[in-house]
C-alpha cells in the first residue's frame, strides 16, 4: 500500500483553488481542523487567494473568537456559505447580514445526510425534515439575505407525499481532524469527542474527485492501529498534516493524562 503524503499546514493550504467548494469538520470547539483553517486564512490575507470559495459545514465550528469558521470570515475569501449552525462564527454572520456573501442555513442533520448522498452520487437528500419551516423553499429555502438567489431546496412529491429535496453538489476539498494517522493514511478519532461525519465527508469529497486533507496529532507506524478504531480509511486520504498542541483545542485546554491511549 502506498504511503500517504505528509504536508505542512502551509503546503496543504496551497491545494485549495479559487472557486473551490470546501467542507470543514468539527463541532463547536471540538475536532476542528484548526491548523488547516488557520493556514488557509493566512494565505488569503497574504496573497488574496484562494477567493470565492463555497464553505460547507454541518455543526457550528469555533469559539466566537476568530477560531473555527471565522477563519473564513473575510470579504472575498468566500462567496457562498452553506451551514447548519452559524452562531460560532460571528465574522461569517456579519458578512451574511451585510449582503457580502450568499448565505444558507439548512438543517444540521440534513447536511450530515447530504455528505452521504454526495458520496453515493445521489441527486440529493430527500426527507420530510424542514417541510413548512424556514428550509422549505415556500418559506425562503434557507436563504439568509437578499443576495442569495439560487434555490438549493426543492419540493417534490413521492407516492402522494410532499418531501424536500436538498440538492447535492461536488466537494472539491475537505478539511478534517482525526487523532492518529498511520503511514498509509488510515486515521482514528479515538481521542476526539466523536466521529462527527468524518467518514462520510471523506467519502463525499473523494467521490467528487476532490482532495481529502486530515489534520492529526501524530503519525504512527503502518499496521500499528487497531482496525476497529479507524474512522477514515487511507484509501480516502490524500494528505496528512500534523498539528501543534495548540491546535488540539480551540479553548487551549489539553489534558493528555485523561486521554485514552491507543
Would you name each region that the model predicts?
Residues 186-210:
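Gly/Ser/Thr-rich active-site loops/lids in small-molecule metabolic enzymes
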Residues 252-262:
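Single conserved hydrophobic/aromatic residue that forms the stacking wall/gate
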Amino acid at each position: 500500500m502506498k504511503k500517504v503524503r505528509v504536508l505542512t499546514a502551509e503546503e496543504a493550504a496551497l491545494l485549495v483553488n479559487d472557486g473551490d467548494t470546501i467542507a470543514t469538520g468539527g463541532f463547536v470547539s471540538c475536532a476542528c481542523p484548526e491548523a488547516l483553517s488557520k493556514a488557509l486564512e493566512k494565505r488569503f490575507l497574504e496573497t488574496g487567494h484562494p477567493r470565492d470559495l463555497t464553505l460547507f459545514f454541518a455543526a457550528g465550528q469555533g469559539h466566537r473568537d476568530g477560531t473555527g469558521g471565522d477563519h473564513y470570515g473575510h470579504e472575498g475569501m468566500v462567496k457562498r456559505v452553506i451551514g447548519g449552525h452559524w452562531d460560532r462564527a460571528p465574522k461569517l454572520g456579519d458578512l451574511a447580514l451585510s449582503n457580502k456573501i450568499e448565505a444558507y442555513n439548512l438543517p444540521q442533520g440534513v447536511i450530515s445526510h447530504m455528505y452521504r448522498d454526495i458520496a453515493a452520487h445521489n441527486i440529493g437528500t430527500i426527507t420530510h425534515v424542514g417541510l413548512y419551516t424556514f428550509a422549505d423553499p415556500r418559506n425562503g429555502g434557507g436563504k439568509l439575505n437578499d443576495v442569495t438567489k439560487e434555490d438549493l431546496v426543492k419540493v417534490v412529491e413521492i407516492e402522494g407525499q410532499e418531501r424536500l429535496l436538498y440538492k447535492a453538489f461536488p466537494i472539491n476539498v475537505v478539511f478534517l481532524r482525526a487523532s492518529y494517522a498511520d503511514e498509509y493514511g488510515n486515521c482514528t478519532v479515538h481521542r476526539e469527542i466523536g466521529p462527527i461525519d468524518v467518514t462520510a465527508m471523506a467519502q463525499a469529497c473523494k467521490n467528487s474527485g476532490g482532495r481529502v486533507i486530515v489534520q492529526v496529532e501524530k503519525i504512527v507506524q503502518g499496521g500499528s492501529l487497531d482496525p476497529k478504531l479507524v474512522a477514515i480509511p487511507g484509501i480516502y486520504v490524500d494528505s496528512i498534516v500534523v498539528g501543534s498542541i495548540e491546535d488540539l483545542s480551540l479553548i487551549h485546554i489539553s489534558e493528555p493524562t485523561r486521554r485514552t491511549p491507543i
